[in-house]
Regions:
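Short gly/ser-rich loop at a beta-strand->alpha-helix junction or flexible surface loop bordering the NTP-binding
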Residues: 1-61, 183-186
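Surface segments flanking catalytic/ligand-binding clefts of nucleic-acid enzymes
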Residues: 39-186
Length: 186
């Protein structure tokens, strides 16, 4: 027999469903967001395809958990940290966050800027800065982008792994975001 006859595999969607009984809800949402990520080279399926797969699958251990995680999942997320930030934002009680939101730079007429998390009606956004953002070139790009966002009337905030590692720091950040949203509304 050939090797390909001896080895079987499952689809990525099936694999994510199979891990459901063994991982927490957040990890399952992160995995689902990864399947439907923004990067077309990494995206495995659309959110609708994932939804159809989970709905049409025969009942399995973890199927209820998968359906709940699917409701919390959002297509177009670029990183696990963005997913965690979005889920924590929801848990804090902030308005629904838009992921990888494109903001048109109508002042310069130079296209769009994508932000990790946005509350567009309130002109507030959050960027997650991982280690990738700490090269000189990327740092300068990020500074210019945030200045341009302010010029367009947005209030940008920055989250780091330190925020995700500390409930206190995360609550402080979300408190600032909530105040910025409130000041825009009233």
């Amino acid at each position: 027999a050939h090797a390909d006859e001896l080895v079987s595999s499952v689809s990525a969607m099936q694999a994510v469903c199979q891990i459901a009984p063994y991982v927490d809800e957040r990890s399952l949402v992160i995995a689902m967001d990864w399947l439907t990520c923004a990067n077309p080279d990494l995206r495995v399926c659309t959110h609708d395809e994932l939804s159809d797969y989970i709905r049409s699958a025969p009942r399995f251990i973890g199927s209820a958990k998968c359906r709940k995680a699917l409701r919390l999942s959002k297509p177009g997320t670029d990183s696990p940290q963005e997913t965690v930030l979005r889920l924590e934002s929801d848990a804090y009680g902030l308005p629904e966050a838009h992921v990888n939101y494109e903001i048109i730079d109508h002042i310069r007429g130079s296209g769009t800027m994508k932000v990790d998390i946005a509350y567009p009606d309130d002109r507030v956004c959050i960027e997650y800065d991982g280690n990738y953002h700490y090269t000189h070139g990327r740092w300068m790009y990020d500074l210019d982008k945030r200045n341009r966002l302010r010029d367009l009337g947005f209030t940008p905030f920055v989250a780091t792994r330190e925020h995700l590692a500390s409930k206190q720091k995360l609550n402080e950040l979300f408190g600032m975001v909530a105040r910025a949203i409130a000041s825009h509304r009233y």
